[in-house]
């Protein structure tokens, strides 16, 4: 796991609060948290660090958290051609049989929905979009599968919560709103009567 925005100890502790135990696989030599932010490397040097870690643990999966942090961790002279360098790195890793999961923080307004400012969706097989939306005066979280190369997938926009047991997707998709992907949806279903308290936020099942 290549991380760029948080030190391994803090990353491990925060993951544990979400019900994800990273300590045990690290102790067993099955997982390595590779903190590359302070090294100021080129893309080729970064890839070599990652390949060395993959070889040490015999990994078949790599998490890059995040691409924004990855770019900022590079020496300034290598940021201009980040997209091309990233393409070479991903091609080399997938060619070696490594499955890659990467996160991208997207800064946008509520009325926009870009996938990423890197325009690298062509590199990916699958894209899951997660964002906040405003519903009844509350910020809630929704997710939607944007792309699944080579297969069909659900088109539903689903609400989710993050608990101490991990990510929990809530109930059936909502049909009471449209425009959820804008972050400011419009209600299409029945409203609560004036003066009535709005329905509480759905709770995750234990």
State what each model feature region is.
Residues 1-45:
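Conserved P-loop
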Residues 48, 52-57, 61, 125-126, ...:
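Conserved P-loop NTPase
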Residues 5-6, 103-106, 149:
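A short beta-strand-to-loop transition that corresponds to the Sensor-1 phosphate-sensing loop
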Residues 40-123, 127, 135-137:
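P-loop NTPase motor core
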Residues 1-2, 11-13, 22-26, 60-64, ...:
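Extended hydrophobic-aromatic, low-complexity segments
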Residues 20-28, 119-123, 161:
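Short, conserved catalytic or adaptor-binding loops enriched in Gly and charged residues
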Residues 10-15, 49, 119-123, 144:
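Alpha-helical scaffold elements adjacent to nucleotide-binding pockets in ATP/GTP-utilizing enzyme cores
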